[in-house]
A protein has these predicted regions:
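Active-site neighborhoods of divalent-metal-dependent phosphate/nucleic-acid chemistry enzymes
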Residues: 65-106
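Metal-dependent nucleic-acid phosphoesterase active-site entry motif
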Residues: 1-22
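PIN/NYN-family metal-dependent endoribonuclease catalytic core
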Residues: 7-8, 26-54, 61-62, 66-70
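Acidic active-site catalytic centers that drive phospho-/nucleotidyl reactions
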Residues: 9, 90, 109
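Short helix-capping/linker segments at secondary-structure and domain boundaries
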Residues: 19-23, 49-53, 99-106
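Alpha-helix/helix-capping structural signal
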Residues: 11-12, 72, 110-111
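Acidic, PIN/NYN-like endoribonuclease modules and their adjacent C-terminal/linker elements
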Residues: 1, 94, 99-135
Length: 135
């Protein structure tokens, strides 16, 4: 039986590669656990090829397989955009999650909370303008 594949979203990749990102520490801890699971063959790690290419840390993601976005994925995503009005990049990711039957997603994009997707770690939400901000 093949281990489940977990998607590393662009927000997760950026947080992991950028030490100044507010989610860096959480991403680093999650990635350690994911790599341990990968080494123990309990999961496979995947990310969109275009998302991986946008992060300048190829050695950091050596264990991550690339998912290439094909024309059929873009076409399905465009239909989703027309039907729901969501962002094309998110729609492509949702299409890949469904097509590849990805079990979990590691990411910090709060929009994932609106879908039937199992997230790895908490999804952070931006500070509301009415909430006090701590120094």
């Amino acid at each position: 039986m093949d281990p489940p594949s977990y998607l590393l979203d662009r927000t997760f990749l950026v947080a992991l590669a950028d030490v100044d990102d507010p989610n860096h520490d959480e991403a680093k801890e999650s990635y350690r656990r994911l790599i341990d699971d990968f080494v123990a063959q309990r999961c496979l790690l995947v990310a969109r090829a275009d998302h991986l290419a946008s992060v300048d840390a190829p050695q950091l993601f050596a264990a991550v397989d690339k998912l290439h976005v094909a024309r059929q994925h873009r076409n399905a995503a465009k239909k989703m955009v027309r039907a729901s009005g969501i962002d094309l990049d998110l729609a492509i990711t949702l299409v890949l999650i469904r097509r590849y039957k990805l079990r979990k997603v590691a990411g910090f994009d709060e929009r994932f909370a609106g879908y039937d997707i199992t997230l790895i770690g908490p999804v952070t939400s931006p500070v509301d303008d009415n909430e006090p901000v701590e120094n």
